[in-house]
Amino acid sequence: MAVQHMRIVLSAYLTNGQVNDAAEYLRGLGVSTGPYSVAPQPSPKAAVNLEIGNIEAAEFAEHGNEQWNHFEAAVGQCLSRFGEWLATVPTQNMDRLREAGWKVWSIANLWIDQDQMDFHLPPVLSAQLGRLELELYVLSNE
């Protein structure tokens, strides 16, 4: 597998240039953040990032030759749980956030060690991104 590290967030910012209030954004989502937490904002106008997952392949080195299978399974579980959590967000809440000027999307940052990356979305995540009309940006170091 070429992916060494994956970080995924649900990101949001106000398009009108106002201060991005994390508490206001979370109230707008209208659901418990569950296992997720808000990453520190470097400045008040920086995007609000709800940390969904941050997984390193090196965490699974103790599995020897099975390291990549365990890493891939952990990434898949993380993405599936994210989809299941998104299923709890009512579409009208996301619509209201947009009407209030919030731009909401998801970002997957991948660190890869070669010129290919093996990355796929579980159906539950694809379905929920579509239902909520959320874009997914996949960024990498290559």
Model feature map: region roles:
Residues M1-S140:
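Acidic (Asp/Glu-rich) sequence patches and key acidic residues
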